[in-house]
Structures are given as C-alpha cells and as structure tokens.
Amino acid sequence: VFSKKVNAGAGLNTVIIVYSVINIALGLLIFFFYKEEEFKRDKKALINVPELKRVIRMPETWLNTLIIFCSYAMCCSYFYITPYATEVFGATAIIGAAAGYFSQFVRPVGCFISGFAADKIGASKVCAISFCVMIVSMIGIICTPGKMSLIWIVIISLAGVYASMYACQSMHFAIMEEAEYPVELTGTATAILTPLGYSAEAIAPLIAGYCLQTWTGEKGYKVFFIILTVVAVVGLIANLIWLARTKEKRQMLHAKK
C-alpha cells in the first residue's frame, strides 16, 4: 500500500517506522499497566545437577530433540522453494511471492487442524502423519520436471509442506506429556530440547548456502531439497521409535480422555 503512494524506498522506510512505533507503544503499555508479582528466588541451586543427569539419560529427550530439529529444519528452509519455482519453472515474481505468502495462510489451518487431531489420536501420531505428508510433498517438488505447465504440482506440494511443517511445529512440546517426565523435570527437559532442537535455524542456511554455491541452478536446489527430505525421514524414524516407547503412557492418557 505504502509503495503505491510513494516510491519504493520511502515506502519501506514508512513500513519500518510503523512497525517500530507499534513495538514501542506495546512496550510502554506493558511497562505502565502490567503488574508483575514480586519475584522470590528459590534457595535451591539454579541448576539441579541430579535432575539434569536424569533428563539427559532419558532416550525420550533425544528423540524429542530429533523430532523438533528435523521438522524445524523445514520451517527454516521452505522459502528456498520460491526462488526454485521462479528459476527452474519460469514462474513470475508475483507467483513466487504469492507462493511464499501462501505459507502464512496455511499456517493457522495446519495448526488448527493438528490441535483437534491431537486431542483425538495423540500429538505424536499427528507428528508422524505430518512427517509423512512432508516427505511425500518434498518428493513431489523434487521429481516434478521444470515446466511452467506443471507448476500446479509444485503449488499443491507446497501446500502439503506448509501444512505439515506447521502442524508438526505446533506439537513440538505437546508430545512431552506422552513421555515419563515428572512435572518437576519438564523445565529441565525444555532447557535441553530448545537450544538443540531449534539449532536447525543456524545449520539449515549454512547447508543451503553450501549446496547453492557448489551446484549452481536447479541441481543446487534439488540437492538441498533431497537433504531436507532425508532429514524429514530421520524425523519420522525418531517419531516411530517415540510411538513404540510411549505406547503404554499414551494408552493411559487416551483412557483418561
């Protein structure tokens, strides 16, 4: 909207200023109106070493980490599909941009449906289904010949990638209830899961950059997409092992519902 009224540079500056003013205003509202309870530090040690060791020894901790890492790698990398569509399939810049923005419309749908599905069949089963959809969708993107007439296959596959990756992301910590984590250990477990699982955000761009520099054009993108697909397969395997290890706990949770 701003770029239609003024030149592109001024439009971008206006957008930045508007976002900055909104954030400053929200910060001031929180500062003046949010009343936080007085913080009282627990006399216990900040890091409980025995609890930390207990969490580290649990296989579920590392399975959950793998599930987070393998699904979040896709969340950090899907935007490479847009330049792939424009460069290989000859899609216009408008179609490429629309394909990118399309993810934000699919996000609430994927999260909404996955939430309801998790209540019916369990969070880890939703993750497993999401990984399957993710893998099939990526294979569709990789195997589709670079012809503009076949761009619709890429768009459909993109919808599958978007829906599955956001569905899986919404279950990252929901599956913790299926493991044998006592309540007092969930915080410690999260302290391990978060930095390791979300380290995909630092690693995925490095791998993408290496692939695109080593193999130019279509081949570079396809090599990277194949790596992402393999990572998703690893996530699915970790998910299936999780399902096997948490079977009794999941049955107990389902009985309570």
Predicted segments, located by residue:
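Extracytoplasmic gate region of multi-pass secondary transporters
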Residues: 59-111, 169, 204-205
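Intrinsic disorder in cytosolic terminal tails and internal cytosolic loops
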Residues: 243-257
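Juxtamembrane intracellular "pre-TM" segments in multi-pass secondary transporters
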Residues: 36-64
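C-terminal transmembrane helical hairpin of 12-TM major facilitator-type secondary transporters
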Residues: 123-175
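A late C-terminal transmembrane helix in Major Facilitator Superfamily
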Residues: 180-216
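C-terminal membrane-cytosol helix-exit motif in multi-pass small-molecule transporters
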Residues: 20-40, 238-243
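Helix-to-loop junctions at the C-terminal end of transmembrane segments
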Residues: 111-123, 212
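A membrane-interface helix-boundary motif in multi-pass transporters
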Residues: 3-20, 210-232
